[in-house]
Curated annotation (Swiss-Prot):
HAMAP family: Ribosomal_uL16 (MF_01342). GO terms for biological process: translation. It comes from the Bacteria. Coiled coil: none annotated. SUPFAM superfamilies: Ribosomal protein L16p/L10e. This is Large ribosomal subunit protein uL16. InterPro entries: Ribosomal_uL16 (IPR047873), Ribosomal_uL16_bact-type (IPR000114), Ribosomal_uL16_CS (IPR020798), Ribosomal_uL16_dom (IPR016180), Ribosomal_uL16_sf (IPR036920).
Length: 136
């Protein structure tokens, strides 16, 4: 699963997920899966969607993951009283803003790419849409 090899600090503030997305264009492949909604994707969700796509295209073509879970999320153990410090890091998330391209694909027909992205989108908690590369 995706997570940083090392970080400057173990834990992070919660923060807010506002603002506009960076990386809104399909730049590596021909087809892409773009976020319409705002939210956060865990490393497990990113991997589940990648596996669904890979199986759908039967390992042909190439898939790029354009997001990386670099924010640690902490949780306290069950039945522990409030206080006594911040909890332990349990999983990693990627913050997603509307317009962000999540995955890209190349080397497969458009119908197959649409089907693969549809299966991947079912694994994700945010609303997404299918996009193609625009040549200028």
């Amino acid at each position: 699963m995706l997570q940083p090899k090392r970080t400057k600090f173990r834990k992070m503030h919660k923060g807010r997920n506002r603002g506009l997305a960076v990386g809104t264009d399909v730049s590596f492949g021909t087809f892409g899966l773009k976020a319409v909604g705002r939210g956060r994707l865990t490393a497990r969700q990113i991997e589940a969607a990648r596996r669904a796509m890979t199986r759908a295209v039967k390992r042909q073509g190439k898939i790029w993951i354009r997001i990386f879970p670099d924010k640690p999320i902490t949780e306290k153990p069950l039945e522990v009283r409030m206080g006594k410090g911040k909890g332990n890091v349990e999983y990693w998330v990627a913050l997603i803003q509307p317009g962000k391209v999540l995955y890209e694909m190349d080397g497969v027909p458009e119908e197959l790419a649409r089907e693969a992205f549809k299966l991947a989108a079912a694994k994700l908690p945010i609303k997404t849409t299918f996009v193609t590369k625009t040549v200028m």
